[in-house]
From Swiss-Prot:
Pfam families: Ribosomal_S6. Binds together with bS18 to 16S ribosomal RNA. Belongs to the bacterial ribosomal protein bS6 family. SUPFAM superfamilies: Ribosomal protein S6 (SSF54995). Keywords: Ribonucleoprotein, Ribosomal protein, RNA-binding, rRNA-binding. Residues 97-120 are annotated as: Disordered. It comes from Rickettsia bellii (strain OSU 85-389). This is Small ribosomal subunit protein bS6. NCBIfam families: S6. GO terms for molecular function: small ribosomal subunit rRNA binding; structural constituent of ribosome. It comes from the Bacteria.
Length: 120
């Protein structure tokens, strides 16, 4: 199995509960195929670097994955089909850090709730 980090952006009008459902669906896909989610981080509602369609903001979410390339491809296929996800990027990494990402470290914890940061 390989390690991947996947960041996806959800439309700004989607609620946090709906984002949780999206993440739960992705978690189910990975766990059903003997993979694991090593890290989850919600980075909050942030301005996009440029307008994507009619969207100027989006909810950013990071997933650290320990899975096979085939499962990663299935996860990306699901992201493409989900109309609430406006962009995503998945990269292969050597390892996944136990510490919060630099973006999460720089955020004010008062303004943005952290949904989950886990490490195995």
């Amino acid at each position: 199995m390989s390690f991947y980090e996947s960041v996806f952006i959800v439309r700004q009008d989607v609620s946090l509960n709906d984002i949780d459902k999206i993440v739960d669906d992705f978690t189910k896909i990975i766990k059903d195929n003997n993979g694991a989610i090593v890290k989850k981080e919600y980075w909050g509602l942030r301005a996009l670097a440029y307008k994507i369609g009619n969207h100027k903001k989006g909810h950013y979410y990071l997933l650290g994955l320990d899975t096979t390339p085939a499962v990663k491809q299935e996860l990306e296929r699901k992201m493409k089909l989900n109309e609430n996800i406006i962009r995503f990027l998945t990269q292969k990494v050597d390892s996944i850090s136990n510490e919060p990402s630099p973006i999460l470290k720089n955020q004010s914890t008062e303004n943005t709730p952290v949904i989950d940061v886990t490490a195995n």
